[in-house]
Every structure is written in structure tokens, then in C-alpha cells.
């Protein structure tokens, strides 16, 4: 029987497939006939699933030989997640164990296995914690991490770049900013809960800052683009929705998405600063009132890519999932 020039599906190994980004990436990739998606997981619930490989904790000694067999592309999403005010005795050691040593170990084994491309989901924290309005982070900026999580990601990036120079494996680095979407947790979910109550909120004066956000759909679309795009090789990409918002504007857009009234009281920013100092919450206050913008022009121009989903569309989708989950 003649099969013509039909291409063989590309084998992709994904780490972090049970996390927020990984779960959504698996959903997207499995809809495409071009890919065979394998997952390296800490614990495999279904050990008969031939596409799930139990590897235990990811660190410098994790054995990836079996899942890497016949793999063309690795997408490395797994990480020790950032924790505000980490209470561990030596958080940097723990971040490095997973985010740096674990990443480099996987990359080295990928090279030995003949993997063509390694996509690393890093963090905008490699660039730093904040910017001035109108002075966004750019791809070419020097690394300037300010916390242990960002440092561990920065160190991993530098070692990956060095490995790529000495091998035939291409490395692609993606630095997301704050990611939101259906099922999002942490601070974004907390903000949605507040807005969903329809009560007056004290964010009316926070109008001069700007935050770059990225919907999970836009991030996943960029990752999928980087799997095949020839110009993605050995590049660093920043990613956002392309529309930056102040805290007050973010709350207003969320209220619209949740179909709730929005009353924002103009509490002076100095009150926030004082609260942060008195109660040891300065990091949270800085995030609430500060600016963090990213310039995605390099991403768009290099790949011919643009975010397929607007911020308003992303907020609406996120809000609908939130309301369904909470039976509202």
C-alpha cells in the first residue's frame, strides 16, 4: 500500500505534565496528529500507560534514559515552584537541586540520546522583579534575579546555553510572566475570589503601574510554535498577552469577566507600603503596586507569532471556569 510522503509523528517528552502549564500543554499536543506525547512523572498512577514514565524526583541523579529513547524534542516544564516568603532553612539549595541541577542533568542525557531540541520553561524572574513604566524587560537584558528561585532558573539557563554551544542539540528558552487561565491558583485566584464578591475593593489609586500577564492559552501556543519553528533554535523568548494593565484596570477587567459590579476605593499607596512594613508583607505589596512589563517584539518578529487570545478573552475564559467550579 502506498503511503506517500506522510511524516512520522514527532516524539515529544514533557516534564511537569501534571502542573498548570504542563496539563494544558498535554491537552493541546494530544489534539494534534503530528506528535506522540510522552510524560516523565514523579509517580505514574497508571503504570500500564506506555506514554507515562515514572522517574521519581527530578535532580542531578534522575535517570531519564528510558523516556528519552527515540525522543525528538524535550519540553521541560517541571520545577520547584516559587514560594512567597519561603520558610525552608536553605531554599536556594532546594531550588538549585531541581531547577538547576535537575535541568542540566536532563539536558545532558537528552544530548546523549540524540534529542534535537530542548525547550526550557524558565521565568521572567531571571530578568528581575520589576521595571519602570515604559521600560520593559527585553530578551537581551543581563540576568538580574533578585530571589533564590530566579537565581536557580538563571543558572540553569546559562548552563543550557553552554551545552548547546558544545553539542548539536538546540536550546529554546521561554520566560513567562504571571500565567493565568482556567484553574489558576495562588494570588490570581485569590484576587478573583475578592472581585467575585462584588464588594468595594481598595485598589482605586493603583492606576499608574503596569503589569504584563500571559494567558495559559497564549503560553501554550508559543511553546507549540517553538517545537517546530526553525528560527526558534537557540533563542530566548519573553511572552505576554501584549496588553499591559494597571492593578485597578486588572480588577475592572476581572469584574467585567465575572459580571460583577466594581467599586474601587482610592486608598493611598503609602497606606499599602505602611501595611507591608508593619505586617511583613512588603513583597506582596510591591507586586500589587509595582510595575513589571515585558517586551515581546523579539518573540513576535522572530517567529511571526502573535498572542492568539486577548487579555479580555483570557479573563473571560478564566472567570467562566472559576464560576463553574464554584457553582455560581
Curated annotation (Swiss-Prot):
Where along the chain is the active site annotated? 149 (proton acceptor)
Position of the signal peptide: none
The enzyme's E.C. designation: 5.1.3.2
**Pathway the protein acts in:** Bacterial outer membrane biogenesis; LPS O-antigen biosynthesis
- One protein family per Pfam: Epimerase
| Residue sites binding NAD(+) per the record | 20-21, 41-46, 57-58, 77-81, 123, 149, 153
Query: EC top class, in one word?
Result: isomerase
Catalyzed reaction equations: UDP-alpha-D-glucose = UDP-alpha-D-galactose
One example of the protein's molecular function in GO is: UDP-glucose 4-epimerase activity
Which prosthetic group or cofactor does it need?
NAD(+)
Keywords in alphabetical order, please: Carbohydrate metabolism, Galactose metabolism, Isomerase, NAD
What residues does substrate bind to? 123, 149, 198-199, 215-217
Q: How does it assemble?
A: Homodimer.
| Functional note | Involved in the metabolism of galactose. Catalyzes the conversion of UDP-galactose (UDP-Gal) to UDP-glucose (UDP-Glc) through a mechanism involving the transient reduction of NAD.
What name does the UniProt record give this protein?
A: UDP-glucose 4-epimerase
**Source taxonomy:** Bacteria, Pseudomonadati, Pseudomonadota, Gammaproteobacteria, Vibrionales
Amino acid at each position: 500500500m502506498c503511503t506517500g510522503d506522510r511524516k512520522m509523528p514527532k516524539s515529544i517528552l514533557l516534564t511537569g505534565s501534571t502542573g498548570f502549564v504542563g496539563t494544558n500543554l498535554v491537552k493541546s499536543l494530544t489534539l494534534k496528529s503530528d506528535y506522540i506525547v510522552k510524560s516523565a512523572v514523579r509517580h505514574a498512577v497508571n503504570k500500564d500507560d506506555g506514554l507515562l514514565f515514572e522517574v521519581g524526583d527530578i535532580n542531578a541523579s534522575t535517570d531519564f534514559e528510558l523516556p528519552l529513547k527515540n525522543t525528538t524534542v524535550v519540553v521541560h516544564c517541571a520545577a520547584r515552584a516559587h514560594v512567597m516568603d519561603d520558610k525552608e532553612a536553605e531554599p536556594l539549595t532546594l531550588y538549585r537541586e531541581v531547577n538547576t541541577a535537575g535541568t542540566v542533568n536532563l539536558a545532558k542525557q537528552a544530548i546523549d540520546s540524540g534529542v534535537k531540541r530542548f525547550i526550557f520553561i524558565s521565568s521572567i524572574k531571571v530578568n528581575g522583579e520589576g521595571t519602570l513604566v515604559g521600560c520593559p524587560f527585553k530578551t537581551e537584558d543581563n540576568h538580574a534575579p533578585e530571589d533564590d528561585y530566579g537565581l536557580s532558573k538563571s543558572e540553569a539557563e546559562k548552563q543550557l546555553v553552554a551545552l548547546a554551544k558544545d553539542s548539536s542539540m538546540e536550546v529554546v528558552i521561554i520566560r513567562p510572566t504571571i500565567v493565568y487561565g482556567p484553574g489558576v491558583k495562588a494570588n490570581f485566584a485569590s484576587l478573583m475570589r475578592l472581585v467575585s464578591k462584588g464588594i468595594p475593593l481598595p485598589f482605586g489609586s493603583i492606576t499608574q503601574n503596569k503589569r504584563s500577564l500571559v494567558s495559559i492559552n497564549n503560553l501554550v501556543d508559543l511553546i507549540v510554535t517553538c517545537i517546530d519553528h526553525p528560527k526558534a533554535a537557540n533563542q530566548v523568548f519573553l511572552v505576554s498577552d501584549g496588553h499591559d494593565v494597571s492593578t485597578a484596570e486588572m480588577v475592572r477587567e476581572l469584574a467585567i469577566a465575572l459580571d460583577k459590579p466594581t467599586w474601587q476605593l482610592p486608598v493611598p499607596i503609602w497606606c499599602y507600603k505602611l501595611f507591608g512594613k508593619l505586617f511583613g508583607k512588603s513583597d506582596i505589596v510591591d507586586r500589587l503596586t509595582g510595575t513589571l512589563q515585558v517586551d515581546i517584539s523579539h518573540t513576535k518578529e522572530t517567529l511571526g507569532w502573535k498572542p492568539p487570545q486577548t487579555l479580555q478573552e483570557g479573563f473571560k475564559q478564566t472567570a467562566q471556569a472559576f464560576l463553574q467550579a464554584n457553582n455560581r
